[in-house]
Amino acid sequence: LEEWLRVMKISKSYGMNHYRYHTCCPPESAFIAADMLGIYMEPQLPFWGTITEEGEENHNQEEQDFLVEEGFNMLKFFGNHPSYCMMSMGNELWGSKKILNDIIGGYKKFDNRHLYTQGSNNFQWFPNVIENDDFFVGVRLANDRLIRGSYAMCDAPLGHIQTDKPAANHDYDSIIRPQKQANSTEVSEDGTVQIQYGTTMKTVKASEADADFIPEVPIVTHEIGQYETYPNFKEIEKYTGSLKARNFEIFRERLEEKGLLPLAEDYFKCSGKLAVQCYKEEMEAVFRSRLLGGFQILDIQDFSGQGTALVGVLNAFMDSKGLITDSEWREFCNDAVVMARFDSYVIEAGSSFKAHAELCNYRPELKGGKLICTLALESGEVIGKVEKDFVSEGNYTDICDAEFTFPQVEKNTKAVLSLEIEGTDIHNHYDLWAIPTVEKTDISGAYIFDEVNDEAESLLKQGKTVLIVPNLSRLENSIEGFYCQDFWCYHMFCIISQMMKKPDP
């Protein structure tokens, strides 16, 4: 019990109030700890595969009966715990919707106190809601109706954090209730589709997706985040038991062979800072969305398997990696989050900066308050302040607009936009950058080429101005620029993409 309390107290200090157990059910001590701390628990049946009907290929009735009985045992032994709130039939399942619906129906007849779902991200590109679903968990509502910020390349299209310029303006409401039809996912002529399955891929049967699919039950976004950081080699010494950090040792050896080991600490800190920025935007996109019922971050701690997925702000021991404190994390992950909505973190000096302040609030006692919004340079110089009294409107409140004019600066200068609800612990901040006024370069007399050729070289020898804008498709060894960390584990998903004959990450 003490260890479960330790782990869950740490998670709760980071604003987490919910645990989903990937294809497993924890022991009773976990439920006791969750009861004591106020954590919502969602155990899953121990299954990640295809639910078949009798007579179908690979049908195993004995296995299916075992799974169903496991579910009844979970309800019998743990169902009375107040924390046992939800239950899932497994992870990323395929197969018979009828059997899944019947299984849930049996559990509801036995114990209807819980909320049930057919699974987490079932049918992947072909999402659906069955009759007995109490809520929906997934990553998309159609091929291009995405409800999380990042994806593996084998699950493309990629998310907004991977493809868009950094901003604080994304939400999923127009995706959940779209104004126009989305693109549906196509299946092959034999009615199959290739999917990622653990660390590999498999082929499953699928029917055409409904591009207009709109769940009429609460929507939970599945396994969000997954932003990887560089290894912290100082963690190697923490492995004092039977397990050793051989993966970290290999990574360190590779870095040393390249003569880059002195940069290891910088790589760790810089990649971690970027990962935290990605997580902040990921979480705030959820909290900005009025039509989302919740989220399940894949993990707040590192995962040592699947090729090494260092996606946590905590390491595998649940210790802080020093990238962000729990109080800083709670600015954008809590039962009340005040946010600013704006289009760019970079503002030209002398220009106007506009932001919209809003509050996502699940505190019944918070009926209203006063917003204080301040923009200041890193030096402490206050550019402007806006104060606004408001009345809380349910779970989501549009508070006000704020507009500031940035002063002239001679060099790139950091500014901080701060928001707080006066007299509470609800506050948030955004690091902005003011850049000097950009003078446009006159290139009217320049000769522009997309490659270095004889004509370009001849013009250069004549003293002419030549600008080379390369064709990116010809730069075989280049890395596409984007402001985001790798997803989960580069090596694992690179292999899966190659198996599925899709582009490398």
Report each predicted region and the residues it spans:
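Glycine-rich phosphate-binding "P-loop"
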Residues: L1-E3, E57-D65, T424, Y430
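Short, surface-exposed connector motifs at secondary-structure boundaries
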Residues: K9-H18, P82-M86, E439-T441
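Carbohydrate-binding surfaces of carbohydrate-active enzymes
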Residues: I224-Y227, I236-P505
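Non-catalytic positions within long, well-ordered alpha-helices that form the structural scaffold/packing
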Residues: K9-K12, D35, F287-R288, L460
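Aromatic- and glycine-enriched glycan-recognition loops and surfaces
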Residues: E2-P26, I448-F449
